[in-house]
Amino acid sequence: VTLLLAVALLVAPAPVAGAEVVAQPQAADTPAVRLDLPQLKARLAKAAGGVPDLSNTDLSGLDLAGLDFKAANLTKARLADARMAGANLFSCDLTDAVLTGADLSHANLDGTVLRRAHLDRANLQGASLFATIIEAADLRGADLSGARIIGYLRSANLSGAKLRDANAGADPGNQSMGVMRATFVGADLTGADLTGANLFKADFSHATLASAKLANADLRNAELVQADLTKADVTGAKVSKANLDEADFSGATGVARLVGLGEARNRDKAIFDAN
């Protein structure tokens, strides 16, 4: 319940054995402290119920599969190419973290803050991102196929990302705290693959979906206000009760096969190619 309310309201050198060493920074700020797996586990154990401070640590390339991060502070952490399949990152703060190419398949990212995080080319297949803040994050080329996404992705870059069969649809039976849905307002999904994705009630207002694959996607009740769907494939997509106010379908394929177009809101204000 706490997570639901929070989202509703939010809008290197090799380490020396046994010693923490300073790794070369990836950004022009505080150098990161390189940790090996035993050192990381020691820090997590030392927290003893508190919030582990792993900010500015370098964990790049480590095998962290299944590890419980205990709601750690991982701001500006380096986790590029880390193997984190099935890891528990519940309620962690990964603001400005670097997770380029990381394997986060089936990881628990519920309640996690990933604001401005670098997740380009990351594997998030089957991951859970419920009540997750992913604002302005870099997810270019990331794989979120089959992931559960009820999060805040305003201004995120998902160009070329894979979201095939992703479940980003609102749960009609779990709205006691207000509308809980995936928010892609102003996000860049150019060329993204959302084939068969559940996008029920998702908010794509002002988002760029140019050349995106939306075949058989469920966009019922979705907000597509001023969304750019130029040259997108919308074959078989469900749009009944979706808000199409000034949505641009110019050059889109499969428009004639949209399901429920006659029931869409503001259909007359949408932009379609002339017959």
Describe each model-derived feature in a short phrase.
Residues 1-12:
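Bacterial N-terminal signal peptides
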Residues 11, 16-19, 23:
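Boundary at the C-terminal end of the N-terminal hydrophobic targeting segment
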